[in-house]
UniProtKB/Swiss-Prot annotation:
It comes from Mycolicibacterium paratuberculosis (strain ATCC BAA-968 / K-10) (Mycobacterium paratuberculosis). The active site is at H696. This is 5-methyltetrahydropteroyltriglutamate--homocysteine methyltransferase. InterPro entries: Cbl-indep_Met_Synth_N, Cobalamin-indep_Met_synthase, Met_Synth_C/arc, UROD/MetE-like_sf. It comes from the Bacteria.
Length: 756
């Protein structure tokens, strides 16, 4: 059967629901408030509405199997029967799935890390020597049948075998998972046959790993694998999707295989990639010309120019997003506070689908058919270029002056001596990363302030009570360096964005970070200006309640960029320095208020690292420079902390050392302290706090378990440089879990401290 050609599609779509319905349903299930039937009903409704909306908008190929209760890599591990043995002990299939993702009282969760250079986190499959791959196609077949029954032109989407293995982790003495690629090819061939038998005309196999340098043999592997899969006698047409950058030599390799379509990211990859591969002349090129991971409106005229150049290089050209719209909010419609100019510059998920359809129509019927849409796009482009909010001469001049004079602090040993004399901390000092649980009282107060039920003064009174409670709790637990708990902050980036010029904070711009965790990235559209202190009053109040040091808590410039939708009209380095200047001014004001410890978090340092090694040094140069610009305005006696989240730390370990923070805390529990060896390898000599327990899991670690982690850390870090802290902030945990875990952490620190 000849597959029906398609002209307009998207790589994938969000699954959390336009009002975060899936978040509420899964959290209700985890808490035991609702049952499986209720959860599955919500999921089915979300799938139905998503598919219907995409088809109604004009897509003639709709991705399915992009829904997930937690994560698509975990879904693929289930499909390949590759869950670890410890999770298999759970008899119920859904509870087994969630145990692998989140852990429970008996099962440690799988590791979690960033999905390429995005802020989405995926669950890392473990491939052991005992892992026996086998096909479990129930989910993908079920969703295909659902969609076809609904009359949807459905295209199942599955993570491809190369990407699955390159993003998995070998355990228990296993070699690199990619060494087992040959075992997966017949399983994928079996899947293709089942999909064809159940009515799929097309299948999309996602291979974003091909745009990275993760495997030098990737181009050859891609050609070999897709030659075999493309030669299968019973299969749908195959569309191999690459995204997040340039597939390089893999593009030509794929073009030499029998697959029918290849997706290319023409937003984050070069426009010339397709023209350089003559073998594409017989293929459908799925052209990712609409940015799937940022919120700026597409310049339709420029995108059409790109598409037109492709027409002579491919048998067919289909229009698509550059990647899944999982990474952007659902729609601009709820954003009623947007001014007309800013609104005209933006496109969220629904608007991006409309852009794809418009561009496909222009290719089919000519530019005249979409003349009004092109005119509106041109007007938005012109409006954005001329808006005065995009340029502040004073900020730019200050940055130039500071950078020219150098952004360096004093000698680390001298700083440590000065800080020791000021702080008088014991060996293995205990602390937490920053946030404490956002209680129902906090959320109610925030909602009451928004609705006008309470005024700002009453809101501040309630937040100060929360701060006082957190300070009291920490003193009772015996922590050494305290935090104020951040009750006043809705989000560690949005809180600052709401107080800085150049940002717009959305009302409903939610995107998935991991599992049920959703974030609302602000939009950074203009030059960044700090007009007033943002945290000093809250931190000073917390410090007034205790004789122990309270950390000032700030978010670093790279993380603010990584977790925002950032302007694309100037280099990221320039924008990072503008944010860094605002943070620098805040650190100076905190120091003037008597705060002796200031934490500038950079959990997303690894996130923005370019996927190709050739581009990485330049990024790390300006990322480190921005952090130093933010932190070099304080005295040697002020202790600067930073915190970094799950990532492949080894790739940026030199940059972590170059940040030159006095204390660096890192997520390390799930990866079993592996990062400490990496730090030692680059001669890291400042203090470090490797996370001693995993806060992403609801399980409470025992004192013995934490003590064991501390002793493991002491084998790599001397006691005088080792701090004791959880993996990350505690915002998403419940208060009982936090108290029990921290009690055990402090007890473990005392136990180990006695022996050093």
């Amino acid at each position: 059967m000849t597959p029906q050609a398609f002209t307009a599609t998207v790589v994938g779509s969000p699954r959390i629901g336009p009002k975060r319905e899936l978040k509420r349903a899964t959290e209700g299930y985890w808490a035991g408030r609702t049952g499986r039937a209720e959860l599955e009903k919500v999921a089915a409704t979300l799938r139905r509405d998503t598919w219907a909306g995409l088809a109604a908008a004009g897509l003639d190929s709709v991705p399915v199997n992009t829904f997930s209760y937690y994560d698509q890599m975990l879904d693929t591990a289930v499909m390949l029967d590759a869950l670890p043995e410890r999770a298999r002990q759970v008899s119920d299939d859904l509870d087994r799935y969630f145990a692998a993702a989140r852990g429970n009282s008996d099962v440690a969760p799988l590791e979690m890390t960033k999905w390429f250079d995005t802020n989405y986190h995926y669950i890392v499959p473990e491939i052991a020597p005992t892992t026996k791959f086998a096909l479990n196609p129930d989910k993908v077949l079920s969703e295909l049948k659902e969609a076809l029954a609904q009359g949807i032109p459905a295209r199942p989407v599955v993570i491809g075998p190369i990407t699955f293995l390159l993003l998995s982790k070998g355990v228990d003495g296993a070699g690199a998972p990619i060494e087992r690629l040959e075992e997966l090819v017949p399983i994928y061939a079996e899947l293709l046959s089942l999909l064809a038998d159940n009515g799929a005309q097309w299948v999309q196999l996602d291979e974003p790993a091909l745009v990275t340098d993760m495997c030098a043999d990737a181009p050859a592997l891609a050609e070999a694998v897709y030659n075999k899969l493309g030669s299968a006698s019973n299969r749908p047409a195959i569309y191999v999707a690459t995204y997040f950058g340039d597939p390089g030599a893999s593009l030509a390799g794929l073009a030499r295989t029998p697959v029918e379509a290849i997706g290319v990211d023409l937003v984050y990859g070069p426009d010339t990639a397709v023209a350089a591969v003559p073998e594409l002349a017989g293929k459908t090129v799925v052209a990712g010309v609409v940015d799937g991971r940022n919120v700026w409106r597409t310049d339709l005229a420029a995108a059409l120019d790109k598409l037109t150049t492709l027409l002579g290089s491919a048998a067919r050209v289909a229009v698509s997003t550059s990647c899944s719209t999982l990474h952007v909010p659902y729609s601009l419609e709820p954003e009623t506070d947007l001014d007309d100019a800013l609104r005209s510059w933006l496109a969220f998920g629904r608007e991006k689908v409309a852009e794809v359809v418009t561009l496909a129509r222009a290719l089919r019927d000519g530019r005249e058919a979409v003349a009004d849409e092109i005119a509106a796009s041109n007007a938005a482009v012109a409006s954005r270029k001329s808006d005065p909010r995009l340029h502040n001469d004073r900020v730019r001049a200050r940055i130039d002056s500071i950078v020219a004079s150098g952004s360096h602090r004093g000698d680390p040993a001298q700083r440590r001596a000065s800080q020791d004399a000021r702080l008088h901390l014991p060996p293995l000092p205990t602390t937490t990363i920053g946030s404490y649980p956002q209680t129902s009282a906090i959320r109610k107060a925030r909602a009451a302030l928004r609705s006008g039920e309470i005024d700002q003064a009453e809101y501040e009174r309630r937040m100060k009570k929360e701060i006082a409670d957190v300070i009291t709790l920490q003193e009772q637990l015996g922590l050494d360096v305290l935090v104020h708990g951040e009750p006043e902050r809705n989000d560690m980036v949005q809180y600052f964005a709401e107080q800085l010029e150049g940002f717009f904070a959305t009302q409903n711009g939610w995107v998935q970070s991991y599992g049920s965790r959703c974030v609302r990235p602000p939009i950074l559209y203009g030059d960044v200006v700090r007009t007033h202190p943002m945290t000093v009053e809250w931190i000073s109040y917390a410090q007034s309640l205790t004789d122990k040091p309270v950390k000032g808590m700030l978010t670093g410039p790279v993380t603010i960029l990584a977790w925002s939708f950032v302007r694309d009209d100037q280099p990221l380095a320039d924008t990072a320095n503008q944010v860094a200047l605002a943070i620098r001014d805040e650190t100076v004001d905190l120091q003037a208020a008597g705060i002796a410890v200031i934490q500038v978090d950079e959990p997303a340092l690894r996130e923005l690292l370019p996927l190709r090694r050739a581009d990485q040094d330049e990024y790390l140069r300006w990322a480190v420079g921005a952090f130093r610009l933010a932190t070099s305005g304080v005295a040697d006696s002020t202790q600067i902390h930073t915190h970094l989240c799950y990532s492949e730390f080894g790739e940026v370990i030199g940059a972590i050392a170059d940040l030159d923070a006095d204390v660096t805390s890192l997520e390390a529990a799930r990866s079993h302290m592996e990062v400490l060896d990496d730090l030692n390898a680059v001669g890291f000599s400042n203090s470090v706090g490797p996370g001693v327990y995993d806060i992403h899991s609801p399980r409470v670690p025992s004192t013995a378990e934490i003590a064991e982690s501390l002793r493991a850390a002491l084998r790599a870090v001397p006691a005088e440089r080792l701090w004791v802290n959880p993996d990350c902030g505690l915002k998403t945990r419940n208060p009982d879990e936090v108290s029990a875990s921290l009690k055990n952490m402090v007890a473990a620190a005392h136990e180990v401290r006695a022996g050093v």
